Amino acid sequence: MAKEEYVSRMLVMLIMIMPLVAQGSRLHSWANRLEETGKDKVTNLQFYFHDTLSGKNPTAVKVAQGTDTEKSPTLFGAVFMVDDALTETADPKSKLVGRAQGLYGSSCKEEVGLIMAMSFCFEDGPYKDSTISMIGKNSAMNPIREMPIVGGTGMFRMARGYAIARTNWFDPKTGDAIVGYNVTIMH
């Protein structure tokens, strides 16, 4: 009886471990394949970021603020968590290519300046399931802003580069915005 129980337990453990071993070898071979590409590739991407703070289904929500944030003309200390749509064109109904997921916070007392920590997660096309990571200051009132790309995953592993942001549309009452991003990365 004890021997049968031992064999049963071993079979269950083996069944549970096999998929993990198989998955690990697939991930390893995929990672090696990416590393063997040789020279860096330069990729340029254009997409639109739809930041919606208003309505029944906002994609950006305030998650924290300082004690004096409401008194500040720049909302200094406000922190927002986002899951914003990325589309092919500025039209919100255009093709969804991914999501911008991360956070931004008002980090300047004298100007509208945001510190942004964002992953652009691609859900369609040749870059499906790949991401690029951006972190840096966004001087939101400037017509053109540049922020660094500091990493990536999937097809963009080891990415570095820059993002140029231009506000396409902004509603000062709600804070909703559509921002065009032109991203140049080496990977």
From Swiss-Prot:
Glycans are attached at N182. GO terms for biological process: phenylpropanoid biosynthetic process. One of its GO terms (cellular component) is apoplast. The keyword Transcription regulation does not apply. Residues 1-24 form the signal peptide. InterPro entries: Allene_oxi_cyc_Dirigent, Dirigent. It comes from the Eukaryota. Pfam families: Dirigent. It is found in: Secreted, Extracellular space, Apoplast. Keywords: Apoplast, Glycoprotein, Secreted, Signal. The keyword Manganese does not apply. Dirigent proteins impart stereoselectivity on the phenoxy radical-coupling reaction, yielding optically active lignans from two molecules of coniferyl alcohol in the biosynthesis of lignans, flavonolignans, and alkaloids and thus plays a central role in plant secondary metabolism. Homodimer. Belongs to the plant dirigent protein family. PANTHER family: NUCLEOPORIN-RELATED. This is Dirigent protein 23. It comes from Arabidopsis thaliana.
